[in-house]
A protein has these predicted regions:
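Expand to "…catalyze enediolate/carbanion chemistry for C-C bond making/breaking, isomerization
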Residues: 2-533
Length: 533
């Protein structure tokens, strides 16, 4: 392989091949990736254009709603193809980036599934993406190990968790690979390489190539994925439905199309997941032009609020009607070494997971192995001897309306909340552009979704000239003043050495740009990616 393409349909790689690349970017793997890019990039580009058009319609007054043209799919009696036996019990899933030590610890945790993440908890610099593929290949083969500087060795225990790979969203490019002069979709890069290197070993041990699909906004995007999966199955002579996917419902448009998404992916889908933090971010972003739909402090927007509880219940009802799993959302808490503080953390996790389990969710997400026992105990109590709650149909529920899904929750906009948003967003952006996408901040394991909520909340308050609870109007000038003040707080909290050696000035500049721009920037990871190696 050369770095430059020699024909119009070859892929060009901007990085030279080292030892790591040679393991993953083999001639056969690149040939398969090239086929996918050639076949599916044009339609992916049309889907991204459709997102822009849909947002323009919403901005102009057309609120999201259930689609009248697809009512026949919602009304018809059909089910998904089925769920493999090793995915029938997903009561606790742990998520984390594809870094070697984290992969081992997650697979060894007291959980049923590990979602290995190339998306929101990974800052996708080239080396991390390639190393991530190597780490997952070694995990699938059972050969993965890691030793730290102190000589401690990490390796897999018997019967590790089931592995699911989350690929990047449709909007994210892989800038180190181009096709016809354009960057290729990161989603196809992640999918092609994980599938190609692992499908045989996964099937041989009774599992399969399983994926999580993020940031979907329409059933047409789900149909695109179904075509990608079917192409891969046909290419390698695999039965239809070998590839399985769980799709995150984490955008406001998608919540109105859950039946249609399940139907479009019915050969491959096994469930939907409540991606709650990105859903809140999407709510703000999608309804950004509506002054009557502004959310309060991030800390006040919890899953017991009516619009989020409606989303959870509708997802359960829709999934179980179609024989699909309804997965609960993320508990981002980190256990504390302080016993009293840790008890508070575990009680919050218990309450959160109890709400999900009692609503009828089949399982839930955690971000730290230290929460596994608590989450597991909650679901064990509810499930008893059952593997899941597919029989919980919620047929007694009144129909959930578009108005319920779109109604904002009450709560204050406080100066303390705004300042906390600034500190969290700046610290997260600094970590992300430094190559770390999964960051402990103030006792929570944060990924991109939290920073997205933080910066879009402030943008929305500025845009609609909202007032804080202490009477201060939220303006660009107030934000810039607070940003300067909170940078000093961050410096004092972290210490001069960490602060001066970090990229906090770059992070503050990016935060300032995306929070004060007249047009809301779609994803902070897009301009952030330009600052990443």
């Amino acid at each position: 392989m050369t770095e430059q393409a020699t024909t119009i349909d070859e892929l060009a790689f901007t990085r030279p091949y080292g030892e790591q690349e040679k393991q993953i970017l083999t001639a056969e793997a690149v040939e398969f990736l090239t086929e996918l890019v050639t076949h599916f990039t044009p339609q992916r580009n049309k889907l991204l254009a459709a997102r822009i058009q849909q947002q323009q319609d919403i901005d102009n007054g057309m609120l999201p709603d259930f689609i009248s043209e697809t009512a026949s799919i919602r009304d018809a009696d059909w089910k998904i193809r089925g769920i493999p036996s090793d995915l029938e019990d997903r009561r606790v899933e742990i998520t984390g980036p594809v870094e070697r030590k984290m992969v081992i610890n997650a697979l060894n945790a007291n959980v049923k599934v590990f979602m290995a993440d190339f998306e929101d908890s990974l800052a996708p610099d080239w080396n991390k993406v390639i190393d991530g593929q190597i780490n997952l290949r070694d995990a699938v083969n059972g050969t993965i190990s890691y030793s730290n500087e102190a000589g401690k060795i990490y390796q897999l225990k018997p019967n590790p968790a089931v592995l699911i790979c989350r690929v990047r969203g449709l909007h994210l490019p892989e800038k180190h690979v181009t096709w016809r002069g354009e960057t290729i979709p990161g989603s196809l890069f992640d999918f092609a390489l994980y599938f190609f290197h692992n499908y045989q070993a996964l099937l041989a041990k009774g599992s399969g190539p399983y994926f999580y699909l993020p940031k979907t906004q329409s059933w047409q995007e789900a149909a695109w994925w179904s075509e990608v999966f079917s192409y891969a199955e046909d290419r390698f002579n695999l039965p239809r439905g070998t590839i399985k996917a769980t799709l995150l419902i984490e955008t406001l448009p998608a919540v109105f199309q859950m039946d249609e998404i399940l139907h479009a992916l019915r050969d491959h889908i096994v469930g939907l997941n409540c991606g709650r933090w990105d859903y809140i971010f999407s709510y703000i972003k999608t309804l950004k032009n509506y002054p009557d739909r502004v959310l309060p402090d991030r800390q006040a927007v919890t899953m017991d609020k009516p619009f989020l509880n409606a989303y959870s219940r509708l997802l359960i009802k829709t999934c179980h009607k179609r024989g699909a799993f309804a997965m609960g959302g993320m508990a981002a808490f980190i256990p504390s070494k302080d016993e009293e503080r840790n008890n508070q953390v575990l009680n919050k996790v218990k309450a959160d997971k109890s709400l999900e389990a009692n609503n009828g969710h089949d399982g839930t997400w955690i971000a730290h192995p230290g929460l596994a026992d608590t989450a597991m105990a909650v679901f064990n109590d509810i499930l008893g001897s059952r593997k899941n709650q597919l029989e919980v149909m919620r047929e007694q529920d009144a129909p959930i309306t578009a108005d319920q899904l779109l109604a904002p929750c009450d709560g204050e906009r406080t100066e303390e909340g705004m300042r906390a948003n600034i500190r969290v967003a700046v610290q997260y952006i600094e970590a992300w552009i430094s190559g770390n996408g999964c960051v402990p901040i103030y006792g929570l394991m944060e990924d991109a979704a939290t920073a997205e909520i933080s910066r879009t909340s402030i943008w929305q308050w500025i845009h609609h000239q909202k007032t804080l609870s202490n009477g201060k109007p939220v303006t660009k000038a107030l934000f810039r003043q607070m940003l300067g003040e909170e940078m000093k707080v961050i410096a004092s909290e972290l210490g001069e050495e960490r602060f001066s050696h970090g990229r906090f000035d770059d992070a503050a500049r990016l935060m300032e740009q995306i929070t004060t721009s007249d047009e809301l920037i779609d994803f902070l990871t897009l301009p952030g990616y330009r600052l990443l190696a």
